[in-house]
Amino acid sequence: MKFLGENPFYTLLLLTEKPGKWPPWSLVPLPLALAALAGLAWASAAGPAWGWATAGLLLVVALADWALLSSLPRSGASFGPAQPPFLALSALRGLLAVAAALLARWGAALPWALHGTVQLALLFLAAYGTLVEPFLLQVTRLEIASPRLANPGGPLRIVQLSDLHVERLTRRDRALPGTVAGLDADVMVLTGDYLNTTYNQDPQALADLAELLAGLESPEQRYAIWGSPEVDRTDLLRPILEAAGITLLEDRGVELHTDRYHLWIMGVTCSHDRAGDAERLRRLVAEAPPGALTLLLYHTPDLAPEAAALGVDLYLAGHTHGGQWRLPGFGAIVTSSRYGKRYEAGHYREGNSHLYVSRGLGMEGFGMPRARLFCRPELVVVDLAGRAGADPAPRSQNGPEA
């Protein structure tokens, strides 16, 4: 898979895949070795009693980590392998314990108490990130006014679903059709990545996705695009989307014209070749009916400069998951966008264009932890209202050079 190998984030994902296939017993030496190493460091710095206490604490939290991670598939919370996140947590815990031992030379009690608190906090965050936050669905509402819309009957409401990453249906997925129906939207759009990469040919995952999409019976106008080519197997997903009555926009546009709105929805298939994808976007913008508000559906936010230069009114994307793990005051730790944190999540203005990057609903695959931290799953509702004023600016037929 060329793209996966070229993107550092996905290179990391590939590296996590192999440990997910290791037998659980093969993991035992690492926490034992780290507990012994940290125990020796504390014994050397503060005495044998502190060393035994540290080694015992690390073994206890390692057992708790494994109990938590291995229980996730049985509880129906998520369905990824436990081995890679367990190894990562064990390594982090060992590093913290050894680092804390360096402070123990000036007095052991306070550093050990702080170290123990951090170790327990990691367990709490792991439980919260895997069992709680992935199910705290947030409905984000955005209001945009445009002189291209009259809206005598009220705003045009669009609901966006992105990055479902289905492995097996969870309680979040089962609640989704009812949540969408309650939003009373005019148009629903899906912006790619329907199955998790490691499940994208799995018969049960495909059947579960079909059940989920079939349940999304409203609104009547439903459109979808493809996500990353390595994730979305179009040959397997096309029949599922079509059976659910969802219209695929594969490098084409569709015009919706009523007495309430005049909309040109463009779907660009994501190849992660920015120059080629931008050229197909230019063609679709050139085909836009005069006076129509243009809505671009593209899986990643990476065409934002081109879309703004071409005068696209609204651009809905996903792909980044908002980072999936965020730090307060900093935001996404890492994103899979070529622009890094520039378009990590949320609403952006580029000239007269609006971009919204959804945090998505699902989580990364391979051996990555099926966890969200300070980055709740998101359903996006955009209300497009008319605005009196100057005539809208004409659209350019040429974006920036790729």
Model-assigned labels for residue ranges:
Residues 1-137, 390-402:
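Non-catalytic terminal accessory segments
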Residues 150-396, 401:
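Soluble catalytic domains of enzymes that build or remodel membrane lipids, polysaccharides, and related
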Residues 107-118, 122-183:
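N-terminal signal-anchor transmembrane helix
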